[in-house]
Amino acid sequence: MKSIVTDKIKLQKVVTDLPKNKSEEDVISAALFTALKKEKGFGLSANQIGVDKRMCVINIKEPMVLVNPKIVKRSEEAVQYIESCLSLPKTMRKPKNTVRSISVTVETDNLGTVEFGPDEKDKIGTEGHNYFADEGLLECVVAQHEIDHLDGILITDSIRAYNIQRVSERKYGRNDKVMIKSPDGDTEFIKYKKAVPLLEKGYQIV
């Protein structure tokens, strides 16, 4: 049984892609689901159990394995959510407020294109609607959470912290990680100091 990694320095490393190897995928996914079941969680990334490969699992509607997942599209709409993380014990006692895209499109090596989003999108934000009970939205948030892990991003990082200011008004440190969007719609995570010159070329912080 692999233990859950809690060392932030290790967790902030960007992992490498998993080479095509079905037997290795099966071994890693089995270890992930075993750890996930023990911890009673919703999702887990390979680097959370000490395997620095781009792979994660989700278990909400049904068990799902994502090999080399990459978010290729995000909705413009976002939602404030509350998240905890098995690798950050303090957040299990005191969850963090975060902001997540309402829907995302993920490309994977094993499942092809996967769409994540709420089951009742038209009800999100309406009076009296408990969107925390929407399994589709929960699955979407967990997918973003786990893919963040693979990119070395934690829910305690400034990029994920809930902030009522508009993005354009936020203040970033030179080494803070931000997500930028190119004029072509591609997104990637880079340090703010590297993002600044790109803003003049039509890139946006999202």
Predicted regions and their residues:
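Positively charged
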Residues: 1-206
